[in-house]
């Protein structure tokens, strides 16, 4: 059995409902519904969830660990939420959150407007910082990657949009 799949999930104040091949996790920040793979059994035991493979096949074993991680992320998302911080490095690079849109000035001849999907919010504490928040870990990471993709950090000066914890290794310029 997978090591990740063996460990129980603490519900941390979230409500869980199991119904016809899906699990619904409800917490103070929202609700997430996730389909459960038929090769995985889910049992609710007094504030913890236990997952186990249906049989001893490699696929069922692997999926039990995957489903455990997905459900644990859903529980964390509806109780505490997820956030990803981005930093803009470069002269004139600015960001401004307006409702469900993120306006970016990244040195192009036109401003870049990124439409936020439902369930994801963007905040700009300063003009060069972006904080993307939401309850779905996959969606928050996807939006952060899309925003970074407009102007990834270049390897010579490091200008561009980077994750706050990202280390950009700079190349040396050509010598004569």
UniProtKB/Swiss-Prot annotation:
InterPro entries: Ribosomal_uL6-like (IPR000702), Ribosomal_uL6-like_a/b-dom_sf (IPR036789), Ribosomal_uL6_a/b-dom (IPR020040), Ribosomal_uL6_bac-type (IPR019906), Ribosomal_uL6_CS (IPR002358). GO terms for biological process: cytoplasmic translation. PROSITE patterns: RIBOSOMAL_L6_1. GO terms for cellular component: cytosolic large ribosomal subunit. Keywords: Ribonucleoprotein, Ribosomal protein, RNA-binding, rRNA-binding. Pfam families: Ribosomal_L6. One of its GO terms (molecular function) is rRNA binding. This protein binds to the 23S rRNA, and is important in its secondary structure. It is located near the subunit interface in the base of the L7/L12 stalk, and near the tRNA binding site of the peptidyltransferase center. HAMAP family: Ribosomal_uL6_B. Part of the 50S ribosomal subunit. Belongs to the universal ribosomal protein uL6 family. This is Large ribosomal subunit protein uL6.
């Amino acid at each position: 059995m997978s090591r990740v799949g063996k460990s129980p999930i603490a519900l941390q104040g979230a409500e869980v409902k199991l119904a016809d091949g899906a699990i619904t996790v409800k917490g103070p920040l929202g609700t997430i519904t996730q389909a459960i793979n038929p090769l995985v059994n889910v049992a609710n035991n007094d504030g913890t969830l236990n997952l186990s493979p249906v049989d001893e096949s490699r696929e069922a074993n692997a999926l039990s660990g995957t489903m455990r991680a997905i459900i644990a992320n859903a529980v964390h998302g509806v109780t505490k939420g997820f956030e990803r911080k981005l930093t803009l490095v470069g002269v004139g690079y600015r960001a401004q959150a307006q409702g469900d849109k993120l306006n970016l000035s990244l040195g192009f001849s036109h401003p870049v407007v990124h439409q936020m999907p439902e369930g994801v919010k963007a905040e700009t504490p300063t003009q060069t910082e972006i904080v993307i928040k939401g309850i779905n870990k996959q969606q928050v990471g996807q939006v952060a990657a899309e925003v970074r993709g407009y102007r990834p950090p270049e390897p010579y000066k490091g200008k561009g949009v980077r994750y706050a914890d990202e280390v950009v290794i700079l190349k040396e310029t050509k010598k004569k």
